[in-house]
Amino acid sequence: MARICVALDVPWERAIKIVKDLYDFFETYPLILKIGHKIYLEKGGDAVKELKEDFPYEVFLDLKLHDIPSVVGLAVEKISELGTDYTTVHLLGGPEMVKEAVKNKGSMKILGVTILTSHDENYIKFLKSNFEDIKNFTLYLARVGIENGVDGVVCSGEEVEFLKKNIEKDFIAVVPGIRIKKEKRHDQKRVLTPAEAKKRGADVIVIGREITESKNPVYVVERALKMMGEI
């Protein structure tokens, strides 16, 4: 089963209204609630605590940590103490940073960020990387994460099938950049529909603005679930 993760990159009051509406309609479906810098800077760790207290959903604190290993380790420890279910670290931070994150995760799951979906092949040129394409660079980063203990990776839907075929260990594949209407790309360059992402092997499908900017978030989630064959 592929799960929908709702990216709540909106003010806190709006986020709570959306979650309440979704809960009223999808009480038994295991949604994941993702909060990022916007809400975290507004509410701090209380955002995680309140969501966990008021709703039966897993909470994903997406801060994309990237710093020296000791700093990331301390941050991960504090994030875990909030009751967070998932958090992210940038795999570009390297093996030692990843190991320190994993060592301090407690019962939380660590997700390694590969290449953001706002990047395309031009990013490889910008980095002056020896990799010929973004797909193989993503595979390299994913292996760095999985070999050092992450529970899953965040990658584009264009790479998820390639990763699943070329990495022997089981891992959670989290795919952002999902659009029900692919023409609504916003600042994403590599996008798929929910059905396409599931077919290619995504375990968690992240949908943000199509839900949070909709007048009817419930309809958007319901439509995505139908496209995925989950209801």
Curated annotation (Swiss-Prot):
Transmembrane segments: none
Gene Ontology CC entries for this record: cytosol
BP-aspect Gene Ontology terms: 'de novo' pyrimidine nucleobase biosynthetic process; 'de novo' UMP biosynthetic process
Reported function: Catalyzes the decarboxylation of orotidine 5'-monophosphate (OMP) to uridine 5'-monophosphate (UMP).
Family, similarity comment: Belongs to the OMP decarboxylase family. Type 1 subfamily.
Cell inner membrane as UniProt keyword: no
Metabolic or biological pathway, per its Swiss-Prot or TrEMBL entry: Pyrimidine metabolism; UMP biosynthesis via de novo pathway; UMP from orotate: step 2/2
Protein name per its UniProtKB record: Orotidine 5'-phosphate decarboxylase
Enzyme Commission number(s): 4.1.1.23
Quaternary organization: Homodimer.
GO molecular function: orotidine-5'-phosphate decarboxylase activity
SUPFAM superfamilies for the chain: Ribulose-phoshate binding barrel
Gene behind the chain: pyrF
UniProt-listed SMART domains: OMPdecase
Domain of life: Bacteria
Residues the record lists as binding substrate: 9, 34, 62-71, 117, 179, 188, 208-209
Classification via Gene3D superfamilies: Aldolase class I
Reaction(s) catalysed by this chain's protein: orotidine 5'-phosphate + H(+) = UMP + CO2
HAMAP family attached to this UniProt entry: OMPdecase_type1_B (MF_01200_B)
Active site per database record: K64
Organism: Aquifex aeolicus (strain VF5)
First-tier enzyme category under EC: lyase
NCBIfam families reported for this sequence: PRK00230.1, pyrF
A Pfam family annotated for this UniProt entry: OMPdecase
Keywords: Decarboxylase, Lyase, Pyrimidine biosynthesis
InterPro entries: Aldolase_TIM, OMPdecase, OMPdecase_bac, OMPdeCOase_dom, RibuloseP-bd_barrel
